[in-house]
């Protein structure tokens, strides 16, 4: 059985295939389609030869608390049911989380943030994102969302970004 890790970015979708011990076996990327359904179809088609057990994807922007609907400004996606699109296109279980949160979890498991009690991870790509570790746990807002470091209000009386 193989596992997948998908990073949906503003310009490309990065794919990783892992064994059950989470060793990276193969990686590649493809340009990100503009339409969400086309992105889901591309992901399903790219993973099909590997017979993966499920799809795990990180995507930029904000997800609702159930991780079913995403709004990503840099993709021009608003209220996109990405997890459902991935399940429909692939026939597999699919989970979508914020890409900064996904990067934080990966670094905490097997990267530079192993055994770290407090830390910040910053991701720079088409957008700005990241994650925060507090007391050895990934911090989420009271609504369950990952921090959106690229959406920080810079003026005290400014509009939410």
Feature map (PLM): residue ranges:
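Conserved phosphate-binding loops in N-terminal lobes of ATP-dependent enzymes
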Residues: 2-59
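Glycine-rich phosphate-binding loop and adjoining helix at the ATP-binding site
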Residues: 31-44, 53-55, 63-118
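Short glycine-rich anion-binding loops that position phosphate/pyrophosphate groups of nucleotides
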Residues: 11, 60-63, 125-127
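Active-site glycine-centered loops adjacent to acidic/histidine catalytic or metal-binding residues
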Residues: 7, 99, 125
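Glycine/GP-enriched mid-protein hinge/lid loop-to-helix segment characteristic of carbohydrate kinases
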Residues: 16-18, 26-29, 36-38, 95, ...
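A generic "binding-loop/recognition-motif" signal
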Residues: 11, 100-101, 145
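A cytosolic small-molecule/anion-sensing beta-strand core signal
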Residues: 19, 59, 65, 134-135
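Glycine-rich, phosphate-binding/catalytic loops in enzymes
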Residues: 22, 73-75, 138
């Amino acid at each position: 059985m193989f596992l997948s890790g998908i990073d949906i970015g503003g310009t490309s979708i990065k794919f990783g295939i892992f064994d059950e011990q989470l060793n990276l076996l193969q990686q590649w990327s493809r340009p990100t389609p503009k339409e969400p359904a086309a992105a889901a179809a591309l992901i399903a088609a790219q993973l099909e030869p590997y017979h993966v057990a499920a799809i795990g994807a990180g995507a930029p922007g904000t997800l609702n608390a159930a991780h079913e609907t995403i709004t990503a400004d840099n993709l021009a996606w608003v209220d996109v049911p990405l997890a459902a699109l991935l399940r429909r296109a692939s026939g597999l279980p699919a989970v979508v989380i914020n890409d900064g949160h996904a990067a934080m979890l990966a670094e905490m498991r097997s990267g530079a943030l192993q055994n770290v009690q407090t830390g910040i991870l910053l991701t720079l790509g088409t957008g700005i994102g990241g994650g925060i570790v507090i007391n050895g746990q990934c911090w989420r807002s009271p609504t369950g969302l990952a921090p959106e470091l690229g959406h920080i209000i810079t003026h005290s009386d400014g509009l939410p970004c």
